[in-house]
Amino acid sequence: FLSARWWEHLTTWGMRQRHGYTGGQPPFPKAQPMASRRDAWPPGGTPCSDLDFMRFQLLDNYGTDVGILNPLQPSGQGDRNNGFSAAMAHATNEWQLEAWLRKEPRLRGSVVVPYEDSAASAAEIRARAGDPNFAQVLMMSRTAEPAGNPRYWPIYEAAVEAGLPVAFHAFGYSGWAMTNGGWPSFYIEEVSEHATSCQNQVISLVVEGVFERLP
């Protein structure tokens, strides 16, 4: 789903996120592989690679009427190269449509956006406006600056125009240490900070006037 230009970039350089880890490893090196439960791995593949497996395990097994996809990795969100981030976000949205949403009516997608580039994010949201396959816009709770900062407002304005809520998934690629005391050694230290990162974003959205501007 990537153009040849950005596929070459990905295979040559990989993803360059702001976190201080090397070698293209996932941001949860201390956690379960792919940050997923062991029973989420289908036979012969990785999580989110087998629609039938997911359909049986999560939709049919629990009588789920609607499930919303939150594509996390690799989605390009938070990449240092804004052009690549936008290309990956667009490709991820196209992948959702072809591999999942058009094949399973109970699924809805999240509009993945390159949130550190608000103009590109707004363009991606407007490109998906009116598509009933998408239920929300997806951001992460650890952005480079607090989410209420005016630099992110074009994202929220485009979401309002499209009639889509904005969802924040815990974690992200801000480059800042995950705890007030610095970088942690264990996963339990990281995961306990997810709640506070979300709380901080809500406070920022309120005090910066986002809800007043976009009620």
Model-derived regions, located:
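Helix-coil boundary/capping segments in enzymes
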Residues: 1-215
